[in-house]
A protein has these predicted regions:
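Extended, charged alpha-beta segments that form solvent-exposed binding/catalytic grooves
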Residues: 2-204
């Protein structure tokens, strides 16, 4: 007598099969090779971090997107990373600690506790490159050009590039500084995520 085990993946979780898996792997290598050619150095951050410090300055936003659980070994709360960019910032600030310009790149899995408004999947592969210690306009242009090159290598057409500035956001938020802390934080997050529905709830 045999029994059939019925199984399914969690909502928003995908797996890659042939030939798609090979296509994704080849693209990952192609992107990293492009970054290496521009003198970016590879880092491999851990997929797990302490919940109390994950995300650094963006802690609240990053943690709100992370799966968290208690570590059976230490009893501390751990989180699965939902983003690698903030990990790169942490590595530059606390591990490398260089006074020189630092250029890092990475590729790895990220897991989010909920799907975004853009992507159905909660598990994705994030590939990126970051420049630290160089506030010049040349560094900004290098980052933008590298991003556009990455999009080109990915075979994505009809791209729209939105460029923001922290000073502009601060100017927009200035009239709402009298809101209580919770409402102001919600407004700031809605602007960051470009969520019209959330904005309408706060600003009729």
């Amino acid at each position: 007598m045999t029994s059939k085990v019925r199984w399914s993946l969690p909502d928003g979780v995908d797996e890659l099969l042939p030939p798609k898996a090979l296509e994704v792997e080849e693209l990952r290598r192609k992107l990293l090779d492009e970054y290496f050619s521009k003198d970016y150095e590879l880092i491999i951050p851990p997929i797990l971090e302490l919940s109390e410090t994950i995300g650094g300055e963006a802690h609240d936003e990053i943690r709100s997107h992370a799966f968290s659980f208690k570590d059976n070994l230490t009893g501390k709360n751990l989180s699965i990373r939902p983003d690698i960019s903030e990990q790169a910032s942490r590595i530059d600030a606390f591990r490398i600690q260089s006074n020189e310009i630092v250029k890092l790149c990475y590729a790895g899995d990220v897991v989010k506790s909920r799907a975004s408004k853009t992507f159905r999947s909660r598990t994705t592969i994030q590939v990126g490159a970051e420049i630290f210690g160089d506030p010049s306009i040349e560094a900004e242009l290098e980052s933008i050009n590298l991003m556009l090159r990455s999009i080109e290598l990915s075979g994505i057409n009809n791209t729209t590039l939105n460029i923001g500035h922290a000073g502009l956001i601060a100017s927009v938020l200035e009239p709402f500084t009298k809101l209580d802390k919770s409402e102001f934080s919600t407004l700031e997050k809605a602007l960051s995520q470009k969520s019209k529905n959330d904005l309408k709830k706060i600003v009729p």
